[in-house]
């Protein structure tokens, strides 16, 4: 199974697969679509996974930029969060998170497309909740993230 999705127009998901789950009836809003707050929660968890790996420890979400809800998610859709590190500062990490779905319970079966994207900013914190410096030495996750950032087109 391919880790990245490609839609019918050839657009491909960006970054690494962070989280994969199933949209359930308990996650719906009053219209019967999946609730935007649930989607945002999944994105925050997925982005935090990547940020924690880079920061080598605890992180907190401090900002969410440009949240775009592109298409609704239906009950039964496979929901996949992809993350891509955009920037690493002294204690902060910016992660772009895209949510893609794969239709498995409704038409058109098998179709994949992007439904939401946003940029999350996380800050590395110590056990007292104070910001801390992201370790630079012996940090393979940071090295991988920085290498991918340098490869991104402007």
UniProtKB/Swiss-Prot annotation:
Organism: Haemophilus influenzae (strain ATCC 51907 / DSM 11121 / KW20 / Rd)
GO biological process, one term: fatty acid catabolic process
Organismal lineage: Bacteria, Pseudomonadati, Pseudomonadota, Gammaproteobacteria, Pasteurellales
GO MF term list: long-chain fatty acyl-CoA hydrolase activity
Pfam families linked: 4HBT
Family classification: Belongs to the acyl coenzyme A hydrolase family.
Enzyme class: hydrolase
Domain HotDog ACOT-type: start-end pairs: 13-128
Protein name: Uncharacterized acyl-CoA thioester hydrolase HI_0827
Keyword Hydrolase set for record: yes
GO CC, alphabetical: cytoplasm; cytosol
């Amino acid at each position: 199974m391919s880790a990245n999705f490609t839609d019918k127009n050839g657009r491909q998901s960006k970054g690494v697969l962070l989280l994969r789950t199933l949209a359930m009836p308990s996650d719906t809003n009053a219209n019967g679509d999946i609730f935007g707050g649930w989607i945002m929660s999944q994105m925050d968890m997925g982005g935090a996974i990547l940020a924690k790996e880079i920061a080598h420890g605890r992180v907190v979400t401090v900002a969410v930029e440009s949240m775009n809800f592109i298409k609704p998610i239906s009950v039964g859709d496979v929901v996949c969060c992809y993350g891509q590190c955009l920037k690493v500062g002294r204690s902060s990490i910016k992660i772009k998170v895209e949510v893609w779905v794969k239709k498995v319970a409704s038409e058109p079966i098998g179709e994949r497309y992007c439904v939401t994207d946003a940029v999350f900013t996380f800050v590395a914190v110590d056990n007292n909740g104070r910001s801390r410096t992201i370790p630079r030495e012996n940090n393979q996750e940071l090295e991988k993230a920085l290498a991918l950032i340098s490869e991104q087109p402007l």
